Amino acid sequence: MSPVSVISLPSDLCLPTSFIDRSGRELIPLHITIPNVAMRRQGKLMTRASMSMNLRTAVSDDAVIRRRGDFHSNLWDDDLIQSLSSPYGEPSYRERAERLIGEVKNSFNSMSNEDGESITPLDDLIQRLWMVDSVERLGIDRHFKKEIKSALDHVYRYWSEKGIGCGRESVVTDLNSTALGLRTLRLHGYDVSADVLNHFKNQSGQFACTLKQTEDQIRTVLNLYRASLIAFPGEKVMDEAESFSAKYLKEALQKIPVSSFSREIGDVLEYGWHTYLPRLEARNYIDVFGQDTENSKSYMKTEKLLELAKLEFNIFHALQKRELEYLVRWWKGSGSPQMTFCRHRHVEYYTLASCIAFEPQHSGFRLGFAKACHIITVLDDMYDTFGTLDELELFTSAIKRWDPSATECLPEYMKGVYMIVYNTVNEMSQEADKAQGRDTLNYCRQAWEEYIDAYMQEAKWIASGEVPTFEEYYENGKVSSGHRVSALQPILTTDIPFPEHVLKEVDIPSQLNDLASAILRLRGDTRCYQADRARGEEASCISCYMKDNPGTTEEDALNHLNAMISDVIKGLNWELLKPNSSVPISAKKHAFDISRAFHCGYKYRDGYSVANIETKSLVKRTVIDPVTL
């Protein structure tokens, strides 16, 4: 068990701000003393903190002994945010980018002409795929939606059950073109079967590759690996492709010299697809794109693509600065700095949002996601650690009243928590109402109520020491994971219409929402269970599985959960990309990418509690630092 110390709470724990209800009455603070959950647990101390954090108990001003996670402080103070500067908001940079966009569009269009530069029937397919893949990996594809569709329609026209060659008149198919085509077409919703890869196996059932690992051969296997990550449920050949290509590439990295190409391979192996957030991929690919020998001999000069990618990255960086300044003002104005019992990761959450949605018009999505996740974190730390069971029951009831007068029955520190939830959910609903043209508050309130009910159930398990069945814990945990409430209001603020039939395919009762919530619960528990258990929090996916299956070990449980995660990811891929869906990919993409963002945060550890290692690096690389032109 971690060391426990008893300390006095800081005097500013309770928010000094007076809150006013709708009638204009000032709410009078109510100081109450309530027995603490930890007392009932006979000294068992619990938190959902990272393994590197201790748990402290503290005696508050109202004489209640409280548990507090020993979280590190906010890493991004106001002075740092204010010190960020960027000249890329100037019109001249936008004008230069627009000229480059026009030139790249011309390059796309030239591929549609028989007399286009360097275009022949023997390489027209791979050229189109290379162009689409390049603009997507560089993070500039939003400018070329029409051109991308035209290019992929052309490729799909010549797709066969045996794949494609480099060009429409190629005599034989080849693995590189087919793998890149499978990946790219599938990501855009085209109906392409993974069985096409079986045609590239030898008689022994192995993928046919020469023993000599040339750069062209390695790149072919790299594209095979990238394709294998876009797998659907039940596709055995994709599992085989992933296993083969990952092993091949790891061996190749031991032999080839360090170069931009080896770095590209390393990045893809490190992040895969589900945790390789688009803006991070763009930042990394910018570094290798201009130096890659494949690109230097490619079908058009890379300078324009690279310059445009750098300009777009830095122009968005200037917008990020303004949005961060607004977010910090909101965070301070909400009274959040006085909530000393919880983690403050608003900048980190903003980073995740800006890594998956960097269209300028989606400021509401980015800021809404950061706000929603900040609220989720405050509630998480209050329900798991700081609040007593009686207090939490009062808070849960107050949320369902949805009126500032409900705070009269709450302890002082909860008044501030209640008001930030109340005000922020109302504000986000107003933004969503404007975007969707209808009232959204009641629908979104219901989502928040269900979320808090799930937290309340977990608080009861903590108080009693009960370890429920895996199924009971898992179903409740999918709700308490917070995926739904983190995604719902932000996606409704976008310019994408969400009529009722579409919303049902993204929010409940959709498989997309269920699977995204499942990944967050499963991956979160596999990263946090040891620390939770050391602090007395008994219930987790691991402990519940072991209870249901006597004789199993932690390793058995982890293997089972990791297998579940792999299956869930494939199910998520299908829900996003299934062909002939009545709901376009664009309507599902933000919710899907939120799942990727959370998954990224749990890639190495609990990156939300311990945000000063990999998460800090992500913030610096994608938000704080521009690229050099």
Curated annotation (Swiss-Prot):
Cofactor binding notes: Binds 3 Mg(2+) or Mn(2+) ions per subunit.
Residues the record lists as binding Mg(2+) 3: 532
Main location, first listed in the record: plastid
Binding site residues for K(+): 540
Localization (cell): Plastid, Chloroplast
Residues binding Mg(2+) 2: 380, 384
UniProt cofactor(s): Mg(2+); Mn(2+); K(+)
CDD domains named among the record's database cross-references: Terpene_cyclase_plant_C1
A GO molecular function held by the record: potassium ion binding
Domain notes per entry: The Asp-Asp-Xaa-Xaa-Asp/Glu (DDXXD/E) motif is important for the catalytic activity, presumably through binding to Mg(2+).
Record's protein name: (-)-alpha-pinene synthase, chloroplastic
